[in-house]
From Swiss-Prot:
Its main location: cytoplasm. One of its GO terms (molecular function) is tRNA binding. Keywords: Acetylation, ATP-binding, Cell wall, Cytoplasm, Isopeptide bond, Nucleotide-binding, Phosphoprotein, Secreted, Stress response, Ubl conjugation. It comes from Saccharomyces cerevisiae (strain ATCC 204508 / S288c) (Baker's yeast). The gene is SSA2. The lineage of its organism: Eukaryota, Fungi, Dikarya, Ascomycota, Saccharomycotina. May play a role in the transport of polypeptides both across the mitochondrial membranes and into the endoplasmic reticulum. A functional difference between SSA1 and SSA2 proteins is expected. SSA2 can participate in the ATP-dependent disassembly of clathrin-coated vesicles. Belongs to the heat shock protein 70 family. Residues 605-639 are annotated as: Disordered. It is found in: Cytoplasm; Secreted, Cell wall. This is Heat shock protein SSA2.
Length: 639
């Protein structure tokens, strides 16, 4: 059984799954949740990832990072990044044209790249899988939106590397959902529309599935529409209501906003199954309690335009794939936001009453498919995966600039990848000594409106009239969507090439290695912290336990002995209260001192047969402190 997993790295939540014995397991995290918030929190003492980070976001907004997926592989001055910055409670800074997140961590200011933040979330998913499978997990298939361009895909791959994962492949989320769905669909050709409305992004894809072969026909979407936008509508609605009722504006207070947002997210989820729900937040702002309620109808009205706008990309993919909506055989809903009844109704009505499929949990479908793909790539011999072949597509057209700034496409969008295309070009002027090959991605006719991926020079062309030299340009896109462009002058055989992993966005090998080392360091610190806490808990538990045992010992011990142990135990408890941040060694030393006083006296009690069963916790009698893993309480304090 392979230990390869599928990871859905989402904007707001992530999910990990594993395929074995012909079935997929969605793996729950240490909190028992099948999805984990894509949040990382930094405090004075530790780094938190997932639920723990999200739960403290209200108290620590400036140092709790989320939505890293909106930043990954982008430039700082990208309009999307600039727009998002206004809404982030944490600070973004410009480092060599790339966004980095600045936080206070353990008393110092630290900068992290979006890749590092995503790698922490991926690391958390890796640990979740490891504790469930009871073995190391190295290989993973990680998913990205169909819309992600080259540098975003590459940056996601880098994040996996930093987390210590070997990323077998980056696959499109809708493709993954289709695999989850298509495993058992063998036979005639079917057109499947994947409608994926997640926490932060919206993607629609049209696939054809035939004999286990998947082909993506078209993709469209909105990188900025999802559950968070519906939460925002609720948040704004309640800010206005609070203003009306209390004549106060709470939108200036980050903590109040965060608490309100958490309540709104909860209310939204409740409204998917109930017609109305109440929102109750004690002391929300300036000591004022906020108690109110909201109905499903009001929520639908607040988000009406957003819900309606989800149909535009649906129309676009049908146009691109040249299909009528009646030719769509199956509709698959993916992403937690498709649980909203109004969204389901809009989709059903658009397809003239055709019911969408919901057999797979919408927020788990992508990880499910990624796990199947991981099993295939690591050679799982299951009959279920035997005949499955995956064809992905290039999300945007790829081409080069020709005379007059024209975009000449070599690979049109929605081409199946991996793919390779060649075309012959020539010089534009007589005796031109070289050509500049500029590679663009995008759909516009002029290159200035498209996205420059990279460029290189092919020089040393022998003097000749214009149009005579033959320069063959080859575009080769591999299965991860990474592009190699080469050019050869046929007369001389001179050639040059470029691998486009979007250099501007690409982390260098050194950067990645540095970040991998840093990730290891953080992991060690996290482990150190949990060992420190274990020692502290153990000391506390033993001190209290001794106190209790002594108070119940009655006349089996002399008063002086009882006093000695009680006094030492109380001293220890007092010391604990005033030294919560002590090191593991200090806790262990205190335990030694406590045992030096208590052990001889406790031995007397045992000989007198006085200690109740299990009263004396680990290490009695016996001098050395036991290993904290083995002893001490195994439950954690909850907030």
């Amino acid at each position: 059984m392979s230990k390869a997993v599928g990871i859905d790295l989402g904007t707001t939540y992530s999910c990990v799954a594993h395929f074995s014995n012909d079935r997929v397991d969605i793996i729950a995290n240490d909190q028992g949740n099948r999805t984990t918030p894509s949040f990382v929190g930094f405090t004075d003492t530790e780094r938190l990832i997932g639920d723990a980070a999200k739960n403290q976001a209200a108290m620590n907004p400036a140092n709790t990072v989320f939505d890293a997926k909106r930043l990954i592989g982008r430039n700082f001055n990208d309009p999307e990044v600039q727009g998002d910055m206004k809404h982030f409670p944490f600070k973004l800074i410009d480092v060599d044209g790339k966004p980095q997140i600045q936080v206070e961590f353990k008393g110092e200011t630290k900068n992290f790249t979006p890749e590092q933040i995503s790698s922490m979330v991926l690391g958390k998913m890796k640990e979740t899988a490891e504790s469930y499978l009871g073995a190391k997990v190295n290989d993973a298939v990680v998913t990205v939106p169909a819309y992600f361009n080259d540098s975003q895909r590459q940056a996601t791959k880098d994040a996996g590397t930093i987390a210590g994962l070997n990323v077998l492949r980056i696959i499109n989320e809708p493709t993954a959902a289709a695999i989850a769905y298509g495993l058992d669909k063998k036979g005639k050709e079917e057109h499947v529309l994947i409608f994926d409305l997640g926490g932060g992004t919206f993607d629609v894809s049209l696939l054809s599935i035939e004999d286990g072969i998947f082909e993506v026909k078209a993709t469209a979407g909105d990188t900025h529409l999802g559950g968070e936008d519906f939460d925002n509508r609720l948040v704004n609605h309640f800010i206005q209501e609070f203003k009306r009722k209390n004549k106060k504006d709470l939108s200036t207070n980050q903590r109040a906003l965060r608490r309100l947002r958490t309540a709104c997210e909860r209310a939204k989820r409740t409204l998917s199954s109930s017609a109305q729900t109440s929102v109750e937040i004690d002391s929300l702002f300036e000591g004022i309690d906020f108690y109110t309620s909201i109905t499903r109808a009001r929520f639908e009205e607040l988000c009406a335009d957003l819900f309606r706008s989800t149909l535009d990309p649906v129309e676009k993919v049908l146009r691109d794939a040249k299909l009528d909506k009646s030719q769509v055989d199956e509709i698959v809903l993916v992403g937690g936001s498709t649980r909203i009844p109004k969204v389901q109704k809009l989709v059903t009505d658009y397809f003239n009453g055709k019911e969408p499929n919901r057999s797979i949990n919408p927020d788990e479908a992508v990880a499910y498919g990624a796990a199947v793909q991981a099993a295939i790539l690591t050679g799982d011999e299951s009959s279920k995966t035997q005949d499955l072949l995956l064809l992905d597509v290039a999300p945007l057209s790829l081409g080069i600039e020709t005379a007059g700034g024209v975009m000449t496409k070599l690979i049109p969008r929605n081409s199946t990848i991996p793919t390779k295309k060649s075309e012959v070009f020539s010089t534009y002027a007589d005796n031109q000594p070289g050509v500049l090959i500029q590679v663009f991605e995008g759909e516009r006719a002029k290159t200035k409106d498209n996205n420059l991926l990279g460029k290189f020079e092919l020089s040393g062309i022998p003097p000749a009239p214009r149009g005579v030299p033959q320069i063959e340009v080859t575009f080769d896109v591999d299965s991860n969507g990474i592009l190699n462009v080469s050019a050869v002058e046929k007369g001389t055989g001179k050639s040059n090439k470029i691998t486009i992993t979007n250099d501007k966005g690409r982390l260098s090998k050194e950067d990645i290695e540095k970040m991998v080392a840093e990730a290891e360091k953080f992991k060690e610190e996290d482990e150190k912290e949990s060992q420190r806490i274990a020692s502290k808990n153990q000391l506390e538990s033993i001190a209290y336990s001794l106190k209790n045992t002594i108070s119940e010992a009655g006349d089996k011990l002399e008063q002086a002995d009882k006093d000695a142990v009680t006094k030492k135990a109380e001293e220890t408890i007092a010391w604990l209260d005033s030294n919560t941040t002590a090191t593991k060694e200090e806790f262990d030393d205190q335990l030694k001192e406590l045992q030096e006083v208590a052990n001889p006296i406790m031995s007397k009690l045992y000989q007198a047969g006085g200690a109740p069963e299990g009263a004396a916790p680990g290490g009695f009698p016996g001098g050395a402190p036991p290993a904290p893993e083995a002893e001490g309480p195994t439950v954690e304090e909850v907030d």
